[in-house]
Structure formats: C-alpha cells, structure tokens
C-alpha cells in the first residue's frame, strides 16, 4: 500500500473483478462439517478457548481474528471437506474475552453441532460477515491478527481507532504441540495406513506383468485398500505412485 501511494496508486481489496465476467462461477463449497470428540482431540473446545484468551490477555488484545482454516478447525474441534486433501471448512473465527464467533455457512453444521457450539459460547454467523464484524470492532479497542495470514480486506476493515497487534496466532503453537491423545491417534492412523500400503505392495508383486496397470490405476487400488480400513476419511495428499 505504501509503495502504491508513492506512485499515486491505490490497492482496492473489496472488489472481485472475476464476478463481473464469470457468469456461471460455481458457489463456494458447502460440504457438511463434522465434530471431533475429546476422545480424539484430547482437549475440549472450552479448554482451547481458555488458553487462547490467556494469551490474548497477556498481549493486551481485546479481540482475536483468525483466518487460517486449520487454526479455526483446531480451535473449534471441527473438520470439513471444502479443500482437497485437507479436512477443513471455509471459515473465519473471532474470539473475545467473553464470547467467540464462527463465521461459516450455517448449512454445513448439523443441529447437534450448532447446539454444542452454543453451549460453549460460540455464535455462528455467515461466512462473509467477518468483514462487517471487523468494521464494527469497538472504538479504541485492540485486535490481534497475524498480518501474514489474514487477507488484506480484513486488515482494511479495521477501524482507524482500533489498535492492531500483528502477532502469530495464539492457536499456532498449541496446535503444533500434540497431546498424548493426538500422538496415539497418529500412531493408530499410521498403522492402518501401513496395512493399506503393505496390501498394495503385495498386490503389485503378484500382479505386475499379468494385468494392465499404470500410475492412475495403482493409485486407485491404493485408495481402495485405504477405504477398507476403519475410520478412513480421505488422502492427505495425491499419491506419488512413481
């Protein structure tokens, strides 16, 4: 922005030029989200919110705005299917000392999930309302956001009277440090995936040269073996068969 101003230019963040020419643009993904129980996460949503608020308090922040999909899902103990190979939902979140807001398409949340969120003090608002929320931050308050992560429009929506703390999201490090329950989940997942990969290797050794196969068909076979394992959801990346 400063560079543009020196050249008598201006960066506009609130206009999507593609909307003006893409008449049949697909709607945003709206796959159903699901909730992870504490038996898998090791920590409840309330525990995570409490830890985040302690960090906010230590830095003098009144509000936290989160835009990292993985951090939002970690904080809310929710998962989605809006991005290939990554179980996240299109969302934003805001946290204050007294409440929290999840900006998401309400249609992807079951009645049960919505009730659980309400019990934990989380309000649900439409996905795009994060911008209006940011515009209405209390005067002379302080908001924390990671300017390397939030989009430029969110930053532009912050009122001039609101102080911005540019800081690593307080969810980032706790998300990275796995608790005992999560570590055990990793171990079990690797065992199940190892069974699927071992079955693929056995299948390859007994069928190579006997039936037609290429990288695509082998990838499909691996996916077939993985789908047969308990609790399988989907691949974490496209298989590198070669």
Locate predicted features.
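Active-site neighborhoods and metal-handling regions in enzymes and metal-associated proteins
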Residues: 1-242
